[in-house]
Amino acid sequence: MYTAINQASNVRSYELSSIKACISGAAPLPIEVQESFEKLTRGRLVEGYGLTEASPVTHSNPLYGLRKVGTIGVPIPNTDAKIVDLVTGEDLPNGKVGELIVKGPQIMSGYWGTEHEDEAESILRDGWLYTGDVAVMDSDGYFQIISRKRDTIMTGVYSVYPRDVEEVLYENNKVLEAAVVGVGQENGEQKIKAFVVPRPNTSLTKEELIALCKRRLEEYAVPWEIEFREILPKSFVGKVLRRLLTEDKDEGEK
């Protein structure tokens, strides 16, 4: 939504001074989108976090306190959160990447209907909701979402998180939207593919994006392929549906 507002035709002709503060969720908020929106409206835009199973919010950056760009902020009142090992489930210290789990009065007690009991048991343990999101907490208690567990790209022995690559792509001001996915190979490994929507009336090339990634990323994190699209598939709340991008790739190979 914020990207759409930033890019709306004649948006500067509208009176936007009534916008004082907004919160973004549902998908990672690119820093470039945040900065453009705040410059446009003179209001505050902060990133938060939540999920349907948490009714639906657990974290937010303070609107007028310490805001850390690129993070989801701190847990809201009466909510606990921590990072646990992706394999063992053991608590991890600050600075270590693992799975975000949350606990509080807003957490669901389960899914409606007995057919979902096994699914609920897999993500609810001792009152903690296992979010399926890979994250890290800093020394100030601010959390940063790295990736969905299922979206993490395994290339050789390395883990690549889509957001890290997408943030680099957004450094090119000709990029309107970007989404990065892992494309499966016959040997079980994945290659990194980026889908990019260029800004209208620009001369964006794949070569300049690859060159940018090579300057800013480790070699194993550089996309092996970039595909330009007019639009990216999204849910009704504006979240990019990565699975549809990978399904398109699979269909094309059949």
Cite the ranges covered by each PLM segment.
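Alpha-helix capping/helix-boundary segments
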Residues: M1-Y2, L29, I107
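Gly/Ser/Thr-rich phosphate-binding loop
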Residues: N6-R67, D80
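Glycine-centered tight turns that cap/initiate beta-strands
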Residues: N10, S18, R42, N78, ...
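Active-site glycine-centered loops adjacent to acidic/histidine catalytic or metal-binding residues
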Residues: A26, G50, G73, D133, ...
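Beta-strand->loop->alpha-helix junctions that form or flank phosphate-binding loops
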Residues: V46-E53, G73-P75, V181-G184, E227
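Conserved ATP/PPi-binding loop(s) of AMP-dependent carboxylate-activating enzymes
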Residues: V74-N78, E90-S122, Y158-V160
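AMP-binding/adenylate-forming catalytic core of the ANL superfamily
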Residues: G104, S109-G110, D118, G132-A221, ...
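Acidic/polar alpha-helix N-cap and adjacent early helical turns
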Residues: D248-K254
